[in-house]
């Protein structure tokens, strides 16, 4: 008769637990990667569709000023497209900064000027998706903000790293300006403790 010692029994239980844990972590990783892939694909498809819709608005537009319709203020509505040619950044700008909106594009910060208005336009985006390349922006870089009304051109004045509580970064200004905001550090895992701010004046 074969006798199994208490130590052997414990060892077998430990091995079973380790195998179960390994399978659990592999499955969890696969689920997480699948979710990320689906989210990125969804965002890409939305950006393509929104870009086409914006091009159609531009084609039939021609207004001298930004038209403030009810739909322009609706969360997730397409406002325009922002481009920074030197760093190959091109992304559709949506109204608002809800979690869903920022998964699909960059968002106009409520309470700041709208495109076509005097003052400071605030735009926020995630550092690990649409605003990832902001880490490569330089002073004097050109920024284009395109809406159905036309293209507004900006030039970067300064770049600053600040606290999330610094509301002054998107404060109203007399001159027409543009402020881009994302989390910082760019490669931080989890909720980043600071904000990376790019400020530009209209040319």
Residue ranges and their predicted role:
Residues 2, 13-203:
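Solvent-exposed, non-transmembrane regions of membrane-associated and secreted proteins
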Residues 2-8:
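N-terminal low-complexity, intrinsically disordered tails enriched in Ser/Pro/Gly
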């Amino acid at each position: 008769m074969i006798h199994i010692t208490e130590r052997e029994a414990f060892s077998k239980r430990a091995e079973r637990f380790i195998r179960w844990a390994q399978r659990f972590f592999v499955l969890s990783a696969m689920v997480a990667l699948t979710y990320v892939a689906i989210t990125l694909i969804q965002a890409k498809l939305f950006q393509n569709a929104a870009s086409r819709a914006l091009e159609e608005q531009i084609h039939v537009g021609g207004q001298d000023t930004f038209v403030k319709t009810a739909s322009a203020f609706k969360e997730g509505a397409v406002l325009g497209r922002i481009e920074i040619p030197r760093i190959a950044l091109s992304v559709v700008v949506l109204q608002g900064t809800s979690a869903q909106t920022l998964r699909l594009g960059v968002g106009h910060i409520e309470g700041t000027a709208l495109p076509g208005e005097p003052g400071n336009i605030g735009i926020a985006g995630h550092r690990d998706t649409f605003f990832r390349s902001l880490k490569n922006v330089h002073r004097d870089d050109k920024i284009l903000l395109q809406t159905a009304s036309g293209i507004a051109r900006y030039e970067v004045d300064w770049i600053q790293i600040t606290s999330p509580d610094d509301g002054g970064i998107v404060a109203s200004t007399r001159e027409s300006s543009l402020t881009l905001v994302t989390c910082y550090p760019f490669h931080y895992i989890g909720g980043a403790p600071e904000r990376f701010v790019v400020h530009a004046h209209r040319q």
